[in-house]
A protein has these predicted regions:
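Bacterial Sec-dependent N-terminal signal peptides
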Residues: 1-32, 207
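Targeting-peptide/extracellular-domain and disordered-appendage signature
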Residues: 30-101, 106-211
Length: 211
């Protein structure tokens, strides 16, 4: 009888141990995920009187020939990896010389050896460029491609300000880099509003100091 009881107790202990291990494994799985081959990145930056945000996948070179092979020349590319790249403008902007209303767009590129056509498309919720429809294009601009001095291993999109109201959308990967100039669609109006806001803030600051 004692042997039976001990056996039962041992069985219960093993069962409890198995449950504890399962719970711990589940908790670990909830906190961690499998490393992504092409990590997703979100970039948000102040631009003029609002913000610009970009959501994109970052594939690596990994010893491959990129432009002209992995990314064929003359074909629409998702400008990243996995789901299409999304760019959101908080205000109407001048995108490489063309007006784009505030909103979210899919960002695509048609690369050639010497220049890239950078496209903003209404459909920003597709996988890759498999369902890309040129009829949904909002604007496209063609910009020159520059050769980098050092290889860019991971695909990267950045926003580089040139002053408080203008900047460049910089896209680079492997040995190639292209830039699209950005500014508010109504720069004169934005500057006037900005100057007026600065005047108001100065008056408020002076008033606070006097009191």
């Amino acid at each position: 009888l004692i042997f039976v009881i001990l056996n039962k107790n041992l069985h219960v202990k093993k069962l409890l141990a198995a449950v504890c291990i399962s719970v711990s494994a589940l908790s670990f799985a909830q906190d961690y995920s499998v490393p992504a081959a092409s990590p997703r990145q979100k970039v948000e930056q102040q631009f003029s009187m609002s913000k610009i945000s970009i959501d994109y996948g970052r594939p690596g070179v990994k010893g491959r020939k990129i432009f002209g092979e992995l990314v064929p020349y003359g074909q629409v590319w998702r400008a990243g990896a996995n789901s299409s790249t999304k760019i959101t403008f908080g205000q109407s902007v001048n995108f490489g010389g063309k007006t784009v209303p505030a909103g979210t767009y899919g960002l695509f590129i048609v690369p050639t050896e010497k220049e890239w056509k950078v496209i903003l498309n209404k459909d920003f919720q597709q996988w890759g460029a498999y369902t890309y429809d040129p009829k949904q294009d909002v604007v496209d601009v063609t910009v020159p491609v520059n050769k980098l001095a050092d290889k860019q291993e991971w695909f990267e999109i950045t926003l580089n300000p040139t002053d408080e109201n203008t900047g460049n959308l910089v896209i680079k990967w492997d040995m190639a880099q292209a830039e699209v100039p950005l500014k508010p669609s109504k720069l004169d109006t934005v500057i006037k509003i900005s100057d007026k806001l600065k005047e108001i803030k100065k008056i408020e600051s002076d008033s606070t100091k006097k009191s």
